[in-house]
Amino acid sequence: MKLKFKHQKFQEDAAKAVCDVFGGQPYKTFDYQVETRKKDGQTSFEKFTGFRNHPIVPQLTDEIVLKHIRDIQRAQQIKPSEALEGKYNLTIEMETGVGKTYTYIKTIFELNKRYGWCKFIIVVPSVAIREGVHKSLEIKIGRASCRERV
């Protein structure tokens, strides 16, 4: 059985809006070295395939991020935020049954494509929703449908 997902413009717009918040951030992947051991007073480093998202570049200040957010809000006729809430606490609000899971998986793929980010935390309110998200990732909703459109 092959699943076919209908692409909705508002889902793509939401993913684009999140990515646009970080406009000016270069594409970078980030691996790092880990201290593995000390022998005879010398520290030995070994290349370790560890991953993290590259930090936000200093040029992308909180003021610039807030300006990007306000521009997006104005374009959507949403009251502009007065200040950032925490360090980049972004919310996409959608009605039930309109494809939130698809939208944030699409957003993850877009953030990876634009900025090289590869680590994300998905927080859900219940076990049932977690299992649904897990299943969506298992059937490769993101890979099967996002890659066709990205």
Describe the function of each predicted region.
Residues M1-R149:
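RecA-like P-loop NTPase motor core of helicase/translocase proteins
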